[in-house]
A protein has these predicted regions:
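Terminal accessory carbohydrate-recognition/targeting modules of carbohydrate-active enzymes
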Residues: 17-287, 669, 689-792
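Active-site acid/base region of carbohydrate-active enzymes
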Residues: 191, 278-301, 341, 345, ...
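Asp/Glu-centered strand-loop micro-motifs enriched in Gly/Pro and often flanked by an aromatic residue
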Residues: 70-75, 107-109, 123-125, 132-136, ...
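Bacterial N-terminal signal peptides
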Residues: 6-16
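Active-site lining segments of carbohydrate-active enzymes
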Residues: 314-325, 336, 364-381, 385-390, ...
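Active-site core of glycosidic bond-cleaving carbohydrate-active enzymes
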Residues: 324-347, 352-359, 411, 445-452, ...
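Low-complexity, Ser/Thr/Pro/Gly-enriched N-terminal "stalk/linker" regions
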Residues: 21-51, 203, 249-251, 264-324, ...
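Acidic/His metal-coordination segments adjacent to aromatic residues that form catalytic metal sites
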Residues: 308, 366-380, 432-447, 606, ...
Length: 792
């Protein structure tokens, strides 16, 4: 940005802000968070990103305390401090000086992340000074606080503190599409308020920064605050820098600045308490303590990625730093898990945002793919996203029982399914054409994930129609779902690949796709991929077919969607799940299976990314979630747990408390849909919680991994009820206790008389069971239901 100075105030631009002040005796951030969970980062990743987040403002820099250029959506501009739809600052520098010696806070000794804040720790060893740089963003505020805590373990010292801001007010990505024109920045010092004010000269866009000291004005430089302090031996000094902004008015920016300055401690306390409530909902206790920790922190990270712009909407964004806006596919995977964590408000808000923007953009039920924070749509929607949105509506209804919500969005459901079948199924064979999750050139035919998610969408839409009372439409949707199930199991199965195919096509179309794939592999320098693709090419030519058939060219993770959606024929499912294991690493599942180097003596675990942004050979935690869900659907919780463990290896690998988009340390430092490896497979499948809120009923059908012999899930929120499940298995006895807060609800517990390993016999129960289809069924409205079964 160019800096345009206000000449009427030029006299203050070289004037400093100095005053001798004593230690601030107010409670500091360290005190407020002393009992909060925290995770310390690794030394080798100090020069990698971190984020301090709020739903309005967030800050991205490096764990060492610097603010390098980051990101590619707006080249080099995705770091710094953002108040979407504008950026406020590139960052700031802090320097401490004694006499002629200076110490810059740009090489932290360590970085520690808390759920609601983070801290960089520095040590000026020659002066026996320890410095902590804290930062936190209050809820619903367009600003943040940077707090310095300086501890003097040496003699009395006079220190100069210099804070230099780097304002850079620019519009968000795609800003030009909504008339956001970037002007020049004007910086002036407000001598009355003792702060710097920066304004974009073409817009009412503002950034402010100052501190909480009564400073005077003399001798400084542009965008710099200076304070002189006297620090006695073993004394601690605290100073708070407040950064605020507005994209609407100067008045709003000042109001936010003063509000945060006057209430920062109470706002931090309130946010800490809110996060403690997040942790207490769906509280997991299991033998695998690593998974238990991830489960807790993944609930925090769901909140980190909420992006609220009142003029556009509020909802979960995809990830930081390059995806701080909204994606429907990410939401459709992630929000199922928000629901399992009791975070219904985020689900409601995100659905509303996606629906409203899609209606304005498309108007036909098609759900938009990517929406920037100014409301501009980059991609009107991949085909899979519309049926997945349909199922998302049903999922939230199951958790809340909110019939008005269902009625509000059912018109979108109907329009969306109609769009898929009339606009994307030209040959009327029930199998739509277009891009699905795999946005690779040539993969825009009849794709497996589109068909699989559509099959589930018809099932869910049928149930919605029944709830609303449209039985004719319910039957129509159900008929299509049954037909799709049969068709997918027939035409998408590839006996040669021992899995479902990426797509179905003619031999000619498949050979063209292989040619594209070989070209991609050549660009990515993957000789093993080229070798495998040539084998597939040879097989097709030697075994020609005049019929359309399935091809697993890329063997992408989406070939497992029939198992994820739980309609694959069991014999095919078990074969495909074994095949899927070939395309994994210690970190999880390859996005495109052929990217895995299957040659002998190849180390597929060495996957640290040093190159420019690319998804080459990507392994994602979310994909492990797809396989975990799939394994559970076919009664294989041990295998599901293996995938969860793989995903867990990425947690805190590079960013403490976070989980990278691409394992273990590439792409976004925190990607929301990674929660799919935890919420659904653990809450809905291991503990077997099936909410039916409209009926005031919850079905519990646990299928626990063998190693989880003592597990509990407490305070699971379902509409106006809260459920807790306690599971123990030892000495030949399985004990299950279910507690609920609302006795108006029915709890139905289902335990098989015999599973793959054990047979069960009821020895004690607070309610008498019925035996239905070879299963014990316990119905209860009691606040506590407990049963004991003998197994052998």
């Amino acid at each position: 940005m160019h800096i345009l100075l206000n000449l009427s105030l030029i006299s203050v631009l070289f004037i400093g802000c100095q005053q001798i002040v004593q230690s601030n005796t107010n409670q500091n951030f360290s005190d407020i968070l002393k009992n909060s969970p925290r995770i310390e980062g690794k030394q080798e990743y100090l020069q990698s990103p971190f984020s301090t987040t709020g739903n309005r403002v967030y800050m991205v820099g490096h764990q060492d305390g610097t603010f390098p250029d980051l990101g590619w959506h707006i080249e080099g501009e995705m770091g710094g401090i953002w108040n979407h739809p504008i950026k406020l600052m590139d960052g700031f520098d802090i320097q401490i000086t004694e006499a002629s010696e200076s110490f810059k806070l740009n090489k932290a000794d360590k970085f520690t992340n808390y759920p609601v804040a983070n801290v960089h720790s520095f040590s000026w060893k020659d002066k026996k000074l320890e410095i902590e740089r804290w930062q936190f963003v209050p809820d619903d505020k367009q600003g943040l606080v940077v707090q310095l805590i300086i501890k003097n373990h040496g003699k009395e010292r006079n220190l100069n503190l210099k804070f230099t801001g780097h304002p850079d007010i620019i519009p968000t990505w795609l800003g030009d599409e909504t008339g956001m024109e970037d002007g020049k920045d004007q910086s002036v010092f407000d001598s009355e308020k003792k702060l710097w004010k920066i304004k974009d000269d073409l817009n009412e866009w503002y950034a402010l920064f100052g501190n909480d000291k009564e400073t005077s004005v003399e001798k400084t430089s542009l965008n710099t605050l200076e304070d002189t302090i006297s620090l006695k031996a073993e004394e601690t000094y605290v100073i708070n820098y407040v950064i605020a902004g507005s994209y609407t008015s100067e008045q709003e920016a000042y109001a936010t600045y003063n509000d945060i300055k006057n209430n920062m401690n109470s706002y931090l306390t309130a946010k800490r308490e809110r996060y403690e409530e997040l942790a207490n909902r769906s509280k997991l206790t299991v033998p695998d303590k690593d998974i238990e920790q991830v489960f807790e922190w993944i609930k925090y990270s769901c909140d980190w990625t909420i992006r609220t712009i009142p003029e556009v909407g509020s909802g979960m964004c995809a990830g930081l730093p390059d995806y701080p806006w909204w994606f429907s596919c990410d939401a459709e995977y992630a929000l199922k898990n928000h629901m399992a964590f009791g975070q219904f408000e985020t689900a409601y808000n995100t659905i509303h945002l996606l629906d409203s923007i899609s209606e304005v953009t498309n108007g036909n039920g098609r759900i938009a793919h990517e929406i920037s924070t100014n409301g501009a749509v980059f991609n009107k929607g991949n085909v899979n996203e519309t049926p997945q949105f349909v199922s998302l509506i049903w999922d939230l209804y199951k958790w809340t029982g909110d019939i008005n919500f269902l009625k509000r969005y059912f018109p979108t459901v109907k329009k969306g399914l109609n769009w898929v079948m009339t606009e994307r199924d030209e040959n009327n064979n029930l199998l739509p054409d277009g891009y699905g999750m795999m946005e690779i050139e040539g993969l825009d035919g009849e794709m497996i994930d589109i068909s699989a998610y559509l099959q589930r969408a018809f099932i869910d839409a049928s149930k919605m129609a029944s709830e609303i009372g449209d039985n004719k439409l319910a039957d129509e949707y159900k008929t299509k779902a049954i037909a799709l199930k049969e068709k997918i199991n027939s035409v998408f199965w590839s006996e040669e690949s021992k899995s479902y195919g990426d797509f179905i096509a003619t031999d000619e179309q498949a050979l063209k796709t292989i040619a594209n794939a070989i070209e991609r592999a050549e660009d990515m320098k993957q000789p093993w991929v080229i070798e495998e693709l040539k084998k597939k090419k040879k097989y097709i030519k030697e075994n020609p077919s005049s019929e359309i058939r399935a091809f697993a060219i890329y063997h992408s993770y989406v070939v497992n969607t029939p198992m994820e959606m739980n309609f694959a024929d069991e014999d095919k499912a078990l074969i495909a799940l074994e095949t899927a294991k070939k395309f994994t690493s210690q970190f999880g599942v390859y996005v495109t299976g052929i990217d895995k180097d299957t040659r002998e003596d190849t180390n597929n675990e060495n996957v640290k990314r040093e190159s420019a942004f690319s998804y080459e050979s990507a392994v994602m935690p979310m994909n492990a979630g797809v396989l975990a869900v799939s394994e559970n659907n076919y009664g294989r919780p041990n295998e599901a747990l293996d995938y969860i463990k793989k995903a867990t290896t990425t947690f805190s690998y590079a960013y403490p408390g976070g989980m990278y988009e691409v394992s273990p340390d590439f792409g976004m430092m925190n990607q929301t849909f990674n929660n799919y490896a935890y919420g659904v497979p653990i809450v809905n499948q291991f503990f077997g919680i099936d909410p039916q809120a409209a009926k005031k009923k919850v079905v519990i059908k646990p299928q626990m991994p063998d190693t989880w012999d003592n597990a509990s899930l407490e305070n699971v929120l379902i509409a106006d009820n809260t459920i807790s499940v306690y599971y123990t298995k030892s000495d030949g006895l399985l004990t299950l206790r279910v507690e609920q807060e609302n006795s108006d609800w029915e709890v139905e517990i289902i335990i098989p008389k015999k599973d793959n390993i054990n047979s069960f016999e009821v020895t004690k129960s607070s309610v008498e069971p019925e035996i239905v289809d070879g299963k014990y069924v316990f119905d209860s409205k009691a606040s506590t239901t407990e049963l004991v079964l003998k197994y052998e």
